[in-house]
Amino acid sequence: MGIQREEHIDLSAPQILQAMAEEDRPLLLREILHRLGLQKERRQEAREFLRDLAEGGKIVRIRGNRYGLPSKMNLIVGKVKTHPDGYGFVIPEAEGEEDIFISPRNLKEAMHGDRVVARVESIRRKGKEGSVIRILERKTRKVVGKFMRAKNYSYVTPEDERILQEVFISEGETKRARPNQIVVAEITRYPTGRARPEGRITHILGYPDDPEIEPQIIIHKYDLPHRFTSAALKEAQNLPSTPPADEYKGRVDLRGIPTFTIDGENARDFDDAVSIERDKDGGVKLYVSISDVSHYVKEETALDNEAYSRGTSVYFPDRAIPMFPTELSNEICCLHPRVDRLTLTAELRYERNGQRKGVQFYPSVIRSDERLTYTLVREILLEEDAELKRKFEYLLPSLELMAELCQELRRRRTERGAIDFDLPEPEVILNLQGETEDVIRAERNLAHQMIEEFMIAANEAVAHFMEDKGFPFIYRIHEPPKKEAVDEFRRFISNLGYKSMRPDHGLKRVADHSPKEFLRVLSEVKGRPEERVINEILLRSMKWAKYSAKNLGHFGLASDGYTHFTSPIRRYPDLIVHRLLKQVLSEKEVKISDEGLGNKADHLSERERVAMEAEREILNRYRVRFMRDKIGEEFEGIVSGVTAFGFFVELKDVFVEGLVRVTSLHDDYYQYHEKKYCLIGERTHKTFRIGDEIRVRVDRVDVERRHIDFGIVEKIGKGKGDAGTGVTG
């Protein structure tokens, strides 16, 4: 970088980072000024930039007031992920960096979730080891846990085992909590080398036995916004109950076309409706009409800011934490039957064989004819219920044509390699007291597939349209899995006896692999007892899908362009997509940059991940509660994971996972064979590996820690991998 002595040079973060990138050592402030061609009068301005960059982890300040890039000083910026046993890892923010193991001693004062700077101290066979040298940002601001009293003090034992320290509560900050109650403690002082964290009680949730506290635990543990600001509520209450007629101007009127919604029985917010017509040339015209939320929610309003903060709606078995107040999500933006609603429509035209031949997007007005459910559509189309077919006779041609188009779209997606995990999902049934009454397999039928195919088609069409226009946009991306993850999964699946991913069946180099390779695995395991377990393991080997301002394609869908357009009531990215699409359609200037969209994409990806983890955990909590009165009962299950200390078994139908500890296997001494992913008895050579069918007995259920211990009754069947291994079971 040439040195220019010009006072009018604009100072920027990229300039500073570029100057540091060109040096092999950390720089003093005066050296940075010199390299940027700035006089010492700009010192304060530069110092503020450096402080902001250091706080953001882009640069690191070291002894002697020198500044440098972390990558040039063997330093890593990342997030701490701790383990209940006391150690942890730093997950680097930089793409492609491997995780760093941190021993308990080297975690120092860092807590789970903190954003830190770590130094790599050594590189061993199993990977990098290091230590935390600086905490950039504290993630944990409050702790949910059990309130306890000792002789002279009180404390909270965190409910999350990854928070390794108890939180000390001074006498005046207990809010009169009683021992063993579940409370929320706000941290007032973070741990130091000599002292535990300190806090004050802000909420008393109740006793652990009360099922009603489960949603409250999750809300506070994941810090889910669950109360709307008064300003947001006021804006929602001021919305009209029906759209005024003058707002129909400039919209395509689709009220004459049979239109309906298809959702679950318990759904309340209907934001997508579908219609279909035969084209004159024998093809079909599919209309996917999405609630025009952006018409009512303007940028930078209280409603908009609240929705952006939440990012997404969160769904529990007994309630939802919506992104918008009910006046909007269940009323003016909800596509109720037999009322006019404003929508944004994707009109997709297809040949008879499912080949898309054209697309149009436009603001529209619709009137849904019916609120159908997945069950109703299944009974009409698959079970041919005569009474229902008579009742919905006027919609029957549309439903039959949709089923036909769905099969063609699905066939085409499969041919291009789209991965359909089709995992059975658990559905928790609660009684009036909030206790788990049953855990059942959620239904997935032709009606689900129809809506799924149509929404995917609309999302892809919007992404391709916007990319062709060349404007800034927000995409839904799913990057290919890492080579290491592919290699590990290949070894695992081959060890189980499956041939799909052996080197002679493709995947010789990671660059060769495509979704089709994984699709072959799913086809090979289909119908086998271990199908669900292998699907889960394959899913875990994939990267997370996320939002991005760069179109990197969607690996799982085998799509070169994808976005989220179809759910603006419950996903904020869809609302952004609607706004951008409408700006392009109206030929207005798109006023946001790629960088601005990138920042929004990062925030919304994080909010989605928090919501998914919260939803997953509350399901797990209810499933464990379901098992607590099943002590001594026997169930059939599948070995879902094997470790040195035992193996995990997932029960069939109820989707509950528990541990058979190796110490409970008294018939032999079992050793873990890491390369074979199994436990083998020294004397009997009996094996336990993933996919084995097992009958187990429920021995212990710890509701608070969500741990279940099983005892083995018998091994029912061998997994595929036992064949030809020379090991008897």
Feature-to-residue mapping (PLM):
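Classical nucleotidyltransferase
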Residues: 663-670, 683
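Charge-lined substrate channels and their catalytic hotspots, especially those that engage the 3′ end
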Residues: 1-287, 294-340, 378, 678-679, ...
